[in-house]
Amino acid sequence: MTTTETTSAEEAPDSLAERVNNRSRRPSSDAFREFMGSQWGPRPDPGITRSAVADYLPARATAAGEPFSGERLVIPAGTYKVRSNDCTYRFRAYSAFAHLSGLGQEREPDSVIVLEPLPEGGHEAVLYFKPRTSRSSQEFYSDSRYGEFWVGARPSLEEVSAETGLRCEHIDTLRDALAKDAGVVRLRVVRNVDEAVEAMVNEVRMQAGLPFGGDAAETDDALEERLSEIRLCKDEFEISELQRAVEITKTGFEDILRSLPRAVGHRRGERVIEGAFGAVAREEGNGLGYDTIAASGNHANTLHWIDNDGPVNDGDLVLVDAGVEVDSLYTADITRTLPVNGTFSPTQAKVYQAVLDACEAALERANQPGTRFRDVHDAAMKVIAARLEEWGLLPVSAEESLSPNGQQHRRWMPHGTSHHLGLDVHDCAQARREMYQDALLEPGMCFTIEPGLYFRADDMAIPEEFRGIGVRIEDDVLVNPDGSVTRISEDIPRTIADVEAWIASAQGRA
């Protein structure tokens, strides 16, 4: 991997910050700078067109700013996160920034959306970012963060404005824009996203005599809460992107099925599975929406097993929880539990069917008028408790276990059944309880249904036949305009017969 540094060939870096990149040297003579800045051909036409999401951005800005009339709202994209030394992770924007800017993939680090209050009421979304510079500038070839010689073609302000429909300004003008009429105009900022932007806002607030730092925490938290809540109900663009994410995720699962014979016998067979899905995610989407769980055998009973360093054995079940994030940053979230050899054993099938019955009960409850989000979980738990009672595993009746003072069934199903889904795999996490768990289901809501049963190998409270079996089934569902709730992942097989046939077909055995 290449490196850069800012000193001449004759100088050794003095500061620790400079020494991060002290493995190579770059000339800094006037002759070199003049030569590097000349004789470049015209840039090719990038062919910028208005994006499909652009038409939805004004309504999103209006919704975000509605409770904060006359206030200036600052939403950073975030910055690169260091993996090691001078190596960073791929940039992924803060989700509220992506929602308001419409920018996806790895765009645009260190940028900021400002919702600027309008005299007539409402807000205008203004995007501040660092555009490309002339190829006669040193930045072009010397700046490994923004220079086109290092990171590839960068857009101009005009190009991004044409793409998004937003007014775009140079990031260097941000501070003056924030300070304009500060004091008369109140400022809010999303905290813990970009330290530099947060510090800038606090400096402006302090100089204007406004509460800042910890004294402004409640003010700022209300903005973050609002940005989360306006994403609870998806617009048409978001729904189409989620559907596309699910479709690509299905392709990834099909590659997993084809990888199973190779995974068996490999000392890290789980990583064979992880790699098969990851390749599809990167080739067809932006990447993974979250770390893939590829949990074979007893590993399925570790809820967030992402080490994926174990073998995949014939006769085991493998639980795969995975989702593709598309370029717009919307992600799917699907779990399927698969028999490695293509056929469920009787005990595996019994556990699997119980979980599937819980899925069906949850979906049925979601389709009843007046259903609240929390009711979906309760419906699934009734089935789980009933099956555990039938099998003689509960120390009390199912009715007693389901009571607030019982909950013994949760030993084998300790997580929630549902969460909202969108730009984040656990979307809208900062929403108030009354807007999330206690809310009535509304058109546009997209969420998961994912009950499970987890019988750990060392669980002495259950018969041996159950030990080491872990099953979760997860689908992504949508509340339609008429109030009905349907699985947008309905094309991904999940019944016992369909899963077995799916594996056989993928492996050419059908």
Predicted regions and their residues:
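Active-site neighborhoods and metal-handling regions in enzymes and metal-associated proteins
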Residues: 1-510
